[in-house]
Amino acid sequence: MVLALLLLPATLSYAKPYELRMLNHWDNLDGTIERGYAGRSIFWPKLQRDKIEEYARYNEQLGINAIVPNNVNASPKMMTDEILQQTKELADMLRPHGIKVYLAINFGSPKALGFCETADPLEPAVAQWWVERCKRIYQLIPDFGGFLVKANSEGQPGPLDYQRTHADGANMLARALKPYGGQVIWRAFVYSPSDPDRAKQAYLEFQPLDGQFDDNVIIQIKNGPIDFQPREPFSPLFAAMPNTKMLAELQITQEYLGHSMHTAFLAPMWTEFLADVNKVAKCKLVGLAGVSNVGDGSQAGNAPTVLNAPGVQSPLFTLCGNHVAEANWYAFGRLCKNPGLKAEAIAKDWANIFFNEQQQMMDSQQRRGNTQKPENSLTTLLPRKDAVKVLTSMLMRSREAVVDYMMPLGLHHLFAWGHHYGPEPYCAQPGARADWMPTYYHRADAEGLGFNRSSHGGTDATHQYPAKYAAMLDDMKTCSYQYLLWFHHVGWGEQIRHKVGGRAYEESLWLALCRHYQHGVDEVAEMQKEWQKLEGNIQPAIFNDMTKRLECQYRDAEWWRNGCLLYFQTFSKLDLPQFVPSISHSLDFYKSVNLGLTNYECPTIQLLDEKR
């Protein structure tokens, strides 16, 4: 872990820090972490005090000032005295570091815990129960931040169960918190299985409620209208609720970008989003909430075992699943404090800090006589300036590489069922909701590919955006190629203009699709080459671990390219171009791959080698 942070002057531009700079943890009371790829919870079932102290110091230096330590799919037990007492102990640990604790709550808690016959927010007994709970919480935690609520989404209870609105539910809680200065953060991640376009749902449910929320209610909105895809347009809600406080939810953990196995530096995604929110939506956010990638470091099977003397921490230990993934935690914190930073400047700063840490750790090992030489005896130490340049380049190309080999040109939701690791554009789960299936999103057929969200025979999702931006998106000729298949169903032979690796092309959709998938694979190969240049600058254990992860990422990129192109080829009936290498496996082989993972783990390299 990087603890001696040096927040270097990355750029002369400066923007005012966000008021609320929050991490959301999807940690469960049993210690599992939903979409967690770095081990088990440091908060539950018991407080891991040494790791929490390390976590708190790091957050303090980044400027994080609030956390939610539990899953938004919250247990009603969060409101029991036992859990509140443990939360008090956590708050006591974080307070010296300037960090407030909020709790995610289950809206149905008064009913689920047996205190009320209903959870109707307009029922006086329900409102009074929350008043009494808030009174107890603030007796224990005087600076308690408030509640985070996921309601009427993916099976969670909420006010709509009682024919009430989101505003009714949020305001009832807000009034219970109001005397103590507490806030309600109400998530806008909602979607109905019956609507023809999931991307429109949050707007349809929340935009009519603009101005109806109390002043201590904040609406937390995911950056895009679906769910943390490698690339999404910004959610139209950011441009549609001028009388409501809004918080942007970003995902630091890589649920859809290769878990802790793939290198994907997310600052370019976030700065792209913030630029659109500022310039197009003209929205002033209250803050940022990042879905954290922190665990206790116990994620098994991905890294070689390292034996250490008693009291000496393994060089492979990290709270983030792998050492390079720490860059995303760092980038999130930097953007919270200064939203005007450029992604490349953040990458450069983190690379400097990373190499400082590596040098300190190697010096410490040398003093103890515990030096491990690089496997290649000819390895040389790059000058610091050159090493930083190489790592910065690798980070900056990584996210776009992931977009290209997973879901280019605006494709989305092509991942595997359940655990979301690997490609499954052909996924078909009997009895499952249509909007959980990739076919709902890619709409591949003999004519073409993509979801028609235009006003020309589509769902007209484009017109949820501001007028000029909507007009640009609505026209296939002016819509950015990066969002083309998000908003349009495009013919396989239709000529499109796009860019790959900075070079412009005008060619058929099929050729463009193939070119992006191949470019993504090629970019991972370049990332591997860049990493190899750094061998002498990095502890051997960490260098070798990341080398193996990058090898795995390359094979995964090929898996994505092969599975997706073979599948889409069944519709296009077109040959693969010469720049795509021959694919040795059949589509049936890729359809047969089943990793058997849960939502709480990252696949091991061994498992991936066996299965794909």
Each predicted region: which residue ranges?
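Mature, folded catalytic cores of secreted/periplasmic enzymes
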Residues: 62, 92, 96, 109, ...
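Catalytic domains of carbohydrate-active enzymes that cleave complex glycans
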Residues: 289-358, 378-612
